[in-house]
Amino acid sequence: MFEVVIGLEVHTQLNTKTKIFCSCATSFGEAPNTNVCPTCLALPGALPVLNEEAVKKAIAFGKAVNAAINKKSVFNRKNYFYPDLPKAYQISQFDIPIVEKGELFINVNGENKRIGITRAHLEEDAGKNIHENNFSKVDLNRAGTPLLEIVSEPELRSSDEAVAYLKKLHSIIRFLDISDANMQEGSFRCDANVSIRPKGDTKLYTRVEIKNLNSFRFIQKAIDFEVKRQSEAWEDGTYEQEVVQETRLFDTTNLVTRSMRGKEEAAEYRYFPDPDLLPVLLKDEFLQIKIPELPDEKKMRFVSELGIKESDAEVIISSLEMSRFFESLISQNLSPKLCVNWLNTELMGFLKGELTIENSPVDAQKLGDLIKRIEDGTISAKAAKDVLAFVFENTNVEIDEAIEKLGLKQVSDDSAIEAVIEQILNANADKVAEYKSGKDKLFGFFVGQTMKEGKRAFNPAKVNEILKAKLG
């Protein structure tokens, strides 16, 4: 039996307005090579100037993961040649990063586990190579975008743990608002270092790096395939020949990893301090940066103060947008439990395909108006589902207007309900006698008949109250 050893390197693009060492914009999707300047293009004499906002965002992350913030950190040149790297070196941090020795807690199968974070360092992103129609093109818009590279300890033992760690990290980054962490646009990318060893062995064996994984599903599939490949090689006696220190790519069509190139050692990059950048010396006020409430803290508050289930709170804190939507709901002085049900179950049931909580046709104010009408007895919970479906398709219609159009306003007038109940009881005298002789289950029959006659417009609570009084 084997133990899996996984360490993850996450590159997250910081959401600063300008690049890390120049004033070019970081906006995504612009025409190729328009967000560039002499610094981005590595023209002679162009000097880098560090973006203060990038430093602040790195510090905020460090505080969120209980890490040490180094008051002095150094930028280094990482030397390698690639077409999308015009300087032929990347400005990064090596031996003295801005953040180190952090931690993050995950829960897998009901068990809590601490995962160490070795370091988080600032660096610049490279440009982008585009290969099409037998041509290779280079777009340098992305070159110089600030990155925070977050390196975990090799303490993850399965693909499930790796995905749980990444989801937790992704959530923290979003709640800190230091990155949009959009995996499809490449602002949250992961490299996975995977190796195996016999259970009980503490030695670290040959690791393989899988590059640029950009979805949680592909991360899980890539790790699972690589573990299977290495395990089979060990069992077949071909481990030393087939498992070498290398960089592999994940084939998302066939769900396999493929060799890309040999894995470089740190010495091959010839790191040395960048002579154009002074060491970063942090003043005390930088270390006092306030960070917002984090997902786990929100979850605990929702459970303790609002009395909702932990499982429901987990769904709410699953994204920053979901959390904001929920807090907007409860700010309207509504029942927290009703808010949870109508957000987590009813509204989310409508959000499919391209629709997310962020672009939901029904916003928090409109859903809150619907919940108010349930609370004040204007409509029943069952009728409210029809109203939600209607306003979901007819986005310009307000809740009260939808209730009127659909004719779903509840009747709470005692005399109107009593008249229908009298009619039903008189028409079912035999069942009334059976009920009074002990067949309590017939109460549901009387409720159903009354609601049917009332065309679902009767207030169920009133129906129950009057029926109980009539039947004795």
Swiss-Prot record:
Enzyme class, UniProt record, top EC level: ligase
GO molecular-function terms, A-Z: asparaginyl-tRNA synthase (glutamine-hydrolyzing) activity; ATP binding; glutaminyl-tRNA synthase (glutamine-hydrolyzing) activity
Catalysed conversion reaction: L-glutamyl-tRNA(Gln) + L-glutamine + ATP + H2O = L-glutaminyl-tRNA(Gln) + L-glutamate + ADP + phosphate + H(+); L-aspartyl-tRNA(Asn) + L-glutamine + ATP + H2O = L-asparaginyl-tRNA(Asn) + L-glutamate + ADP + phosphate + 2 H(+)
Keywords: ATP-binding, Ligase, Nucleotide-binding, Protein biosynthesis
GO annotation, biological process: glutaminyl-tRNAGln biosynthesis via transamidation; translation
Alphabetical list of Pfam families matching this protein: GatB_N, GatB_Yqey
SMART domains in alphabetical order: GatB_Yqey
Membrane-spanning parts: none
EC number: 6.3.5.-
Domain of life: Bacteria
Binding partners and assembly: Heterotrimer of A, B and C subunits.
Family membership: Belongs to the GatB/GatE family. GatB subfamily.
Functional summary from the UniProt entry: Allows the formation of correctly charged Asn-tRNA(Asn) or Gln-tRNA(Gln) through the transamidation of misacylated Asp-tRNA(Asn) or Glu-tRNA(Gln) in organisms which lack either or both of asparaginyl-tRNA or glutaminyl-tRNA synthetases. The reaction takes place in the presence of glutamine and ATP through an activated phospho-Asp-tRNA(Asn) or phospho-Glu-tRNA(Gln).
PANTHER family assigned: GLUTAMYL-TRNA GLN AMIDOTRANSFERASE SUBUNIT B MITOCHONDRIAL AND PROKARYOTIC PET112-RELATED, GLUTAMYL-TRNA(GLN) AMIDOTRANSFERASE SUBUNIT B, MITOCHONDRIAL
Protein name as annotated: Aspartyl/glutamyl-tRNA(Asn/Gln) amidotransferase subunit B
Biological source species: Campylobacter jejuni subsp. doylei (strain ATCC BAA-1458 / RM4099 / 269.97)
Origin organism lineage: Bacteria, Pseudomonadati, Campylobacterota, Epsilonproteobacteria, Campylobacterales
